């Protein structure tokens, strides 16, 4: 039965972000939802864990079919707290991480707290989805990400996929009717060329802001996530956790 499913929702933007509110509404269509998300923004934390400081958990919302917890740790800490404490001994049917406020395509998957949490969820033997919207603006429209996220979750939950499976899903900017569909892709081979901007505070101490530009090393490769997003498609990249090197295909 659909209402017997248990969905874990998390993110890296914080428990009170607009993206996770949209993700919760999507997840609630498939069953009971437990949210364990960071107390504060944890973007770029990848799979960092907290080892040398205590962690604090508080329940911020509870109603039929939904419990929301704020946790003082990283996104991966949140997943561990859910599986190893709050939901210990229970079967989790799917982990949804997001909806992230910004792209996690290409090499960003390695830096992303959103994807770090999704990958961690797959370690526990259930399907996991990292869902991101490629829009950083404060008034970002999450409708398309929610719509396509629901379609992908339905396929995972009802299609009999073999877990563990982790998907990196990125949704381009646009209304749902403007997008061209879903493309199964590989990760683009690109990188960030960073630059540090040096400044001084009023006390004369120097500080730095990190910025940079993404370098797409294969802009014409039509099988990559970057190409799909640039052409109005939702990109879906299956993510493996084994980092063993294999020769790239030509």
Regions found by a protein language model. Give the residues of each.
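A cross-family phosphate/adenosyl-ligand binding-site feature
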Residues: 3, 7, 21-85
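Structural motif
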Residues: 6, 93-94
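Glycine-rich phosphate-binding loop signature in dinucleotide/nucleotide-binding domains
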Residues: 86-91
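Glycine/threonine-rich flexible loop motifs
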Residues: 103-112
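Glycine-rich phosphate/pyrophosphate-binding loops
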Residues: 122-145
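Active-site rim beta-loop-alpha module in soluble metabolic enzymes
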Residues: 133-136, 146, 155-202
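A conserved acidic, glycine/proline-rich C-terminal tail/linker
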Residues: 200-226
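Conserved small/polar residues in nucleotide/adenosyl-binding loops
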Residues: 245-250
């Amino acid at each position: 039965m659909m209402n017997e499913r248990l969905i874990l929702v998390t993110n890296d933007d914080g428990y009170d972000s607009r993206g996770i509110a949209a993700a919760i509404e999507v997840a609630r269509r498939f069953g009971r939802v437990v949210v364990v998300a960071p107390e504060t923004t944890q973007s770029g934390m990848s799979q960092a864990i907290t080892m040398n400081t205590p962690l604090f958990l508080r329940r911020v919302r509870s109603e039929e079919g939904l419990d929301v917890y704020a946790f003082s740790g990283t996104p991966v800490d949140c997943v561990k707290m859910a599986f190893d404490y709050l939901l210990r001994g229970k079967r989790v049917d799917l982990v949804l991480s997001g909806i992230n406020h910004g792209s996690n395509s290409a090499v960003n998957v390695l830096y992303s707290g959103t994807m770090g949490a999704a990958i961690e969820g797959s370690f526990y033997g259930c399907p996991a989805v990292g869902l991101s919207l490629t829009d950083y603006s404060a008034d970002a429209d999450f409708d398309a990400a929610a719509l396509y996220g629901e379609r992908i979750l339905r396929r995972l939950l009802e299609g009999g996929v073999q877990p563990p499976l982790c998907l990196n899903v990125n949704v381009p900017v646009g209304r749902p009717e403007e997008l061209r569909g879903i493309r199964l892709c590989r990760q683009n081979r690109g990188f960030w060329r960073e630059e540090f901007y040096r400044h001084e505070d009023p006390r004369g101490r120097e500080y730095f802001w990190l910025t940079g530009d993404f370098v797409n090393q294969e802009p014409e490769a039509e099988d990559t996530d970057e190409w799909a997003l640039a052409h109005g498609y939702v990109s879906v990249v299956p993510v493996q956790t084994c980092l063993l090197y294999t020769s790239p295909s030509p």
